[in-house]
Amino acid sequence: MTNIRKTHPLLKIVNHSLIDLPAPSNISAWWNFGSLLGLCLMIQILTGLFLAMHYTSDTATAFSSVTHICRDVNYGWLIRYLHANGASMFFICLYMHVGRGIYYGSYTYLETWNIGIILLFAVMATAFMGYVLPWGQMSFWGATVITNLLSAIPYIGTTLVEWIWGGFSVDKATLTRFFAFHFILPFIIAALVMIHLLFLHETGSNNPSGIPWDSDKIPFHPYYTIKDLLGFLVLILLLMLLVLFSPDLLGDPDNYTPANPLNTPPHIKPEWYFLFAYAILRSIPNKLGGVLALVMSILILAIIPFLHMSKQRSMMFRPISQVLFWILIADLLTLTWIGGQPVEHPFITIGQVASILYFSIILILMPLASLIENKILKW
């Protein structure tokens, strides 16, 4: 008798995706982040569902409802902080996952890569709208500033912003629709994840060497299921350390003040995971130019596969590209720091230099390094 997992229509899909899946024998811990992102998404959907049971999306009661969750609901504080810090863990895993893709040349799987970029945009949109929901000072002013950026679009900009707001300012209509979108988007993300995996399983996983490893594949279970479980434990440990010891470490104190349209906070800034893009936005004195740079800072990922000039897929054996890659990481950390600083000297100049360096490394220096490395191969 054949095993049920190989014959049952539903279990067969699970079997081919998680049990009998042939996987390269040499994939490192950098390949753990895909499953960790799946775990993060599940944590966010579950905690979000329980928060939605007690939250009210009305400007008059939104802030109070969050306070009520933290004070009166059984373990409400835990659910709320798991959700808030879970988002931070989500983005840490996301950025590491993307970084892994760039380093090891996984972007050559075009369909998987492009769905990944769409996923990144969807997660960023979800996180932004979620930040607005507690209706604190930074929620309100963050929503005002970021949605206002769309007014830079020629001709239709102002109309578009008012259409998104549902009025002439960020108000009740905005909060209600943001809650609706924030609730539905994670399920759309989950569907996109399925497509992401579908495309990945068409080609199979990449590996650190970047060389096809078909001659030496091992079953996903038990080898990588155990490895993923270890990753889960580490992620949950780090998340619980954050939630139970310093839940407000990554948040903004201004968000503990109820939203007040008449009082602007001295420094309006988004959550830490958007600061690098925010720094790029601020480094350009022109509004439309800034918005274009902001969008391009993420959309540039879609251009990376077409800038791959190297004869090797992975950066594992490409020292010049490796140095540039780590300079890029340092540059992103610098941008993250600058995004949280006030707009004054010397931060303006540092931000502009870091922004130019960011685009230069990806668009010019990395392709050049690849060509030089190709030449070195012939020596």
From Swiss-Prot:
Heme b b566 binds at H97, H196. Gene3D superfamilies: Cytochrome Bc1 Complex, Chain C. Binds 2 heme b groups non-covalently. One of its GO terms (cellular component) is respiratory chain complex III. GO terms for molecular function: metal ion binding; ubiquinol-cytochrome-c reductase activity. A ubiquinone binds at H201. InterPro entries: Cyt_b/b6_C (IPR005798), Cyt_b/b6_C_sf (IPR036150), Cyt_b/b6_N (IPR005797), Cytb/b6-like_sf (IPR027387), Cytochrome_b (IPR030689), Cytochrome_b_C_euk/bac (IPR048260), Cytochrome_b_N_euk/bac (IPR048259), Di-haem_cyt_TM (IPR016174). It is found in: Mitochondrion inner membrane. It is a multi-pass membrane protein. Its cofactor is heme b. Keywords: Electron transport, Heme, Iron, Membrane, Metal-binding, Mitochondrion, Mitochondrion inner membrane, Respiratory chain, Transmembrane, Transmembrane helix, Transport, Ubiquinone. One of its GO terms (biological process) is mitochondrial electron transport, ubiquinol to cytochrome c. The chain crosses the membrane at residues 33-53, 77-98, 113-133, 178-198, 226-246, 288-308, 320-340, 347-367. PROSITE patterns: CYTB_CTER, CYTB_NTER. Heme b b562 binds at H83, H182. Component of the ubiquinol-cytochrome c reductase complex (complex III or cytochrome b-c1 complex) that is part of the mitochondrial respiratory chain. The b-c1 complex mediates electron transfer from ubiquinol to cytochrome c. Contributes to the generation of a proton gradient across the mitochondrial membrane that is then used for ATP synthesis. The cytochrome bc1 complex contains 11 subunits: 3 respiratory subunits (MT-CYB, CYC1 and UQCRFS1), 2 core proteins (UQCRC1 and UQCRC2) and 6 low-molecular weight proteins (UQCRH/QCR6, UQCRB/QCR7, UQCRQ/QCR8, UQCR10/QCR9, UQCR11/QCR10 and a cleavage product of UQCRFS1). This cytochrome bc1 complex then forms a dimer. Heme 1 (or BL or b562) is low-potential and absorbs at about 562 nm, and heme 2 (or BH or b566) is high-potential and absorbs at about 566 nm. Belongs to the cytochrome b family. This is Cytochrome b. It comes from Lepus mandshuricus (Manchurian hare).
